[in-house]
Amino acid sequence: GALLPDGRRLTGKIDRLAIRENEILVLDYKTDWDPPVELPPDHPYVAQMASYVMALGLAYENRPVRAALLWTSAPRLTWIADDMIRQAISHMAAIT
């Protein structure tokens, strides 16, 4: 797990991580039978990916981190918008 600036430990399992020269890509596989067309900002999957982005951002400070969900039943790739990630991180920080 990653140690957050406030001392809490973040644990989780990233399904796929691509460490590229100019960015970090984090991908999580989802097996929902009926994947949503859109994810609202307060969806638990957005919070999950925001947690990964936050931890990877601490580890790879000089590279942007992008997050996506791969729906295995569709198959479809959904990128999580940066503003949604920032909103979820702000929300997590506010509830601590």
Predicted regions and their residues:
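Structural signature of nuclease core domains in nucleic-acid processing machines
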Residues: G1-T96
